[in-house]
């Protein structure tokens, strides 16, 4: 659970049992045989994002939203480039960010959106093959890394408090046409070769 939901081991035990079992059943993770074959979108998520954008009537693009307010007949979205009125608005953002954007949140919105909590995560894209099994036959699309260690000065890429990390083998998942092995490691709990680190991002 700590690896699947990127949370510290002490919090993983607090996840409701029914939710865990339901998740495992839905993703066929309890099957020992005839497991489903997972597919990925060729070109990555950017491809279907572009497809949606090509069909959408976009008023503002890459524009910061200041706040959203409601009137009797419509919803007003105020941005750094002006404001626009809409019949309704769908928030595709974290619950706490959505709550901050609402200029006049209702009691129900305050109650529901205020209950969400998030875990900070670090994603590192790199080509350090030392994280993988020595035998190439044991390489898989993703690997779980379990260690009890904490971040130290000698391990700058480690995420403090997280004992579970895992790596995606991007060549396998995205069919990359290159000889360099590329990995995306979430919450690395081991030292990575700094010379082989390409990109580092932080998410919630």
Regions found by a protein language model. Give the residues of each.
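Active-site/ligand-binding neighborhood in enzyme catalytic cores
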Residues: 1-72
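Mid-domain catalytic core of redox enzymes
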Residues: 66-204
């Amino acid at each position: 659970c700590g690896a699947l939901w990127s949370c510290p081991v002490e919090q993983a035990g607090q996840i409701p049992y029914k939710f865990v079992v339901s998740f495992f059943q839905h993703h066929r993770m309890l099957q020992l045989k005839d497991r489903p074959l997972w597919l990925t979108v060729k070109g990555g998520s950017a491809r279907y994002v572009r497809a949606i954008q090509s069909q959408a009537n976009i008023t503002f693009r890459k524009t910061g939203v200041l706040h959203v307010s409601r009137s009797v007949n419509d919803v007003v979205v105020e941005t750094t480039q002006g404001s626009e009125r809409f019949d309704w608005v769908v928030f595709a953002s974290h619950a706490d960010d959505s709550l901050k954007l609402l200029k006049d949140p209702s009691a129900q919105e305050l109650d529901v959106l205020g209950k969400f909590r998030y875990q900070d995560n670090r994603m590192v894209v790199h080509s350090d093959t030392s994280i993988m099994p020595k035998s190439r036959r044991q390489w898989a699309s993703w690997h779980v890394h379990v260690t009890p260690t904490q971040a130290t000065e000698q391990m700058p890429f480690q995420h403090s408090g997280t004992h579970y990390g895992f790596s995606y083998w991007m060549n396998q998942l995205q069919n990359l046409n290159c000889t360099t092995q590329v990995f995306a490691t979430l919450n690395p709990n081991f030292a990575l070769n700094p010379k082989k680190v390409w990109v580092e991002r932080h998410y919630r």
